[in-house]
């Protein structure tokens, strides 16, 4: 039996949903906020299927979630980040296929592959959501990429993640350039994914909506709040 209480404060660009499943609490908070300004212990970082971190010529854009992460935490030490990613993939026994891009030989991994990086007492889940060409530009974009990313992410957190406060962007929107991944659609998908979970994998889910998207009028907060309230009520 699932009980839920929904509350939302539109004027502060905040929507929150608190629910309970048996004896477990489920909290979903949706905010207009930059991901790394969210107070959390774990974060989701969408990445390319090469797990490349190169920022030369914006292979990884500084304006992307991954780029912002790298500048904030590994600005002068991307080699260490590469090592941590490769080490975790190897620990999972995941072996990529041989490929090449403008930087040379590289391993390619299936969409939905997750590498967990621990850094400064926080956990970062890199999830492959897009194939890219030799210059790092997304190719073969499909909404199926979003589904694959969610499946891989939720499985990874359940298997080797941490049950804590998890902050995530709207995966598939923005730099991923997946046409069908509209803000409204991905918000709904994210809410549904976590409300439908049978297993508790986090104490709190913080879904971060880009302040730029909000400023550009791409976000309908009232519509989002109504859907969140509906899902919470539906699960009572």
Each model region followed by its residue ranges:
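Macrodomain-like recognition of ADP-ribose-binding/processing modules
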Residues: 1-236
């Amino acid at each position: 039996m699932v009980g839920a209480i929904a509350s939302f404060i539109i004027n502060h660009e905040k929507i929150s949903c608190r629910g309970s499943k048996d004896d477990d609490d489920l909290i979903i908070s949706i905010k207009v906020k930059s991901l790394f300004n969210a107070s959390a212990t774990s974060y989701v970082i969408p990445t390319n299927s090469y797990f490349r971190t190169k920022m030369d010529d914006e292979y990884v854009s500084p304006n992307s979630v991954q780029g912002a992460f790298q500048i904030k935490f590994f600005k002068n030490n991307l080699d260490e980040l590469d090592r941590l990613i490769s080490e975790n993939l190897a620990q999972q026994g995941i072996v990529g296929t041989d490929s090449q891009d403008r930087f040379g030989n590289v391993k390619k991994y299936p969409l939905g592959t997750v590498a967990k990086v621990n850094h400064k007492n926080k956990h970062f889940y890199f999830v492959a959501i897009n194939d890219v060409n030799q210059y790092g530009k997304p190719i073969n974009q499909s909404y199926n990429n979003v589904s694959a990313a969610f499946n891989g992410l939720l499985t990874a957190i359940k298997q080797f993640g941490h049950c804590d406060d998890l902050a995530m962007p709207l995966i598939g929107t923005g730099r991923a350039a997946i046409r069908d991944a509209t803000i409204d659609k991905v918000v709904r998908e994210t809410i549904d994914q976590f409300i439908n979970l049978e297993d508790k994998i986090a104490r709190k889910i913080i879904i971060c909506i880009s302040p730029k998207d909000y400023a550009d009028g791409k976000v309908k907060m009232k519509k989002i709040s109504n859907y969140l309230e509906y899902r919470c009520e539906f699960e009572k």
